[in-house]
């Protein structure tokens, strides 16, 4: 519903009233460059087509997501999360020293919490870096 003070679709629309010349211009005129920036409701998006008519992959079926990652600590029960093992902990850090998220590392929730705690312990003991120095 159009507000009377803002000039709705019948008045020229847009932001700032019927003759403001601000953003908008109601579906056709005024505003920045004519076409209207957030003006009236009709016509501006008609040439886009429906979502299902936009093209893209026509094959259907499965997308190529690849293999599901398995938590390395659950798969190999002999592996333990150890903050003193710098090589193992560096695997879960980016080049900038940030902890790699679970969806990328493939850890389960339990072991991701353990890894994060171990990395934070290693940082406190100066085994692992908080950040990498800028050049």
Swiss-Prot record:
GO cellular component: cytosolic small ribosomal subunit
Ranges of biased composition (kind: Basic and acidic residues): 42-61
Stretches for region Disordered: 1-65
Entry annotated with the keyword Signal: no
Biased composition (Gly residues): 9-41
Keywords on record: Ribonucleoprotein, Ribosomal protein, RNA-binding, rRNA-binding
SUPFAM superfamilies per UniProt: Ribosomal protein S18 (SSF46911)
GO molecular function annotations of the record: small ribosomal subunit rRNA binding; structural constituent of ribosome
Subunit structure: Part of the 30S ribosomal subunit. Forms a tight heterodimer with protein bS6.
Family: Belongs to the bacterial ribosomal protein bS18 family.
Protein name: Small ribosomal subunit protein bS18
UniProt organism field: Anaeromyxobacter dehalogenans (strain 2CP-C)
């Amino acid at each position: 519903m159009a507000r009377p003070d803002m000039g709705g679709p019948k008045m020229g629309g847009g932001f700032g009233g019927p003759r403001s010349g601000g953003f908008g211009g109601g579906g056709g005129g005024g505003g920045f460059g004519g076409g209207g920036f957030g003006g009236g409701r009709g016509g501006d998006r008609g040439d886009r087509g429906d979502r299902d008519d936009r093209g893209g992959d026509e094959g259907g079926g499965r997308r190529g997501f690849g293999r599901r990652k398995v938590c390395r600590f659950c798969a190999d029960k002999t592996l333990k999360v150890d903050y003193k093992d710098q090589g193992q902990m560096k695997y879960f850090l980016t080049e900038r020293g940030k902890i790699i998220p679970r969806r990328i590392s493939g850890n389960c929730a339990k072991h991701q919490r353990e890894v994060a705690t171990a990395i934070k312990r290693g940082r406190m003991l100066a085994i692992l870096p908080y950040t990498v120095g800028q050049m």
